[in-house]
């Protein structure tokens, strides 16, 4: 696994895009192996057709996140009405079988966003689209089909780590629908510049989980669904410099100071 991860990273660095590969492995009697790369195709996302996106200077108190590399889908500028955060600690502590109910609750939020024409961002621990709930959130693509941006977050103490499965049907669906993808690491830094993640900027926004049909009440402390009313969440990604910034542009007048 570590060898293939290194191969994919090396190819990504040279192509400047994630890649889809076909390969064979031949093993010798002493356990050594040789990897033969048969095909390598760059998986280029479309972006939104914005040329020359410029990352703005954003005051830290307004910043939701700032990422360096670990994204797919730029150059782009997007705005969001609804933001969903799956609490990493709460999810990790759930009994294994109950993890699958989180996917069902997210499906309900996805349906709500589609019916009400809400632009939707979701963030959760580990891998999205995994079949193994101990590795992340076991959603099918149909359950997040109205999502505009999806982020995987690390929660190292429970082994939940971002790892988009290049070549999977789930990944292909993200590419084909131009869904923006990003990975948020607890200890991430690039060339000495640390990434930023500040969910506290949403603390005073309206939570609407209980108002959404078909959600599961027992999960209301696991899923936080924020409806931005007077505020708006803006994301700008520059694929050339591999930098992404997301911030709350207008303060909600109902928020306490």
Locate the predicted segments by residue:
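Conserved divalent-metal-coordinating catalytic cores
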Residues: 1-257
């Amino acid at each position: 696994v570590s060898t293939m991860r290194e191969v994919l990273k090396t190819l990504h660095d040279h192509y400047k895009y994630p890649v889809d590969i076909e390969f064979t492995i031949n093993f010798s009697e002493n356990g050594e192996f040789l990897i033969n790369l048969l095909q390598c195709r760059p998986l280029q996302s479309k972006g939104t057709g914005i040329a020359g996106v410029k990352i703005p200077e954003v005051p830290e108190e307004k910043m939701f996140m700032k990422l360096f590399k670990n994204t797919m889908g730029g150059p782009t500028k997007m705005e969001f009405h609804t933001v969903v955060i799956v609490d990493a600690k709460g999810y990790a502590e759930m009994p294994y079988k109950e993890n699958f109910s989180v996917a069902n609750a997210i499906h309900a939020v996805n349906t709500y966003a589609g019916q009400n024409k809400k632009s939707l961002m979701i963030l959760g621990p580990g891998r999205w689209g995994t079949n193994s709930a101990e590795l992340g959130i076991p959603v099918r693509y149909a359950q997040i089909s109205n999502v505009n941006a999806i982020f995987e977050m690390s929660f190292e103490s429970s082994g939940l780590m971002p790892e988009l499965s290049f070549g999977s049907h789930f990944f292909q669906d993200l590419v084909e629908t131009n869904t923006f993808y990003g990975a948020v690491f607890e200890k991430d830094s690039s060339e000495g510049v640390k990434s930023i993640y500040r969910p506290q900027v949403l603390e005073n926004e309206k939570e609407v989980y209980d108002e959404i049909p078909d959600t599961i009440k027992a999960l209301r402390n696991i899923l936080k669904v924020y409806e931005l009313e007077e505020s708006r969440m803006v994301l700008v990604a520059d694929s050339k410099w591999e930098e992404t910034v997301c911030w709350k542009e207008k303060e909600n007048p109902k928020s306490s100071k």
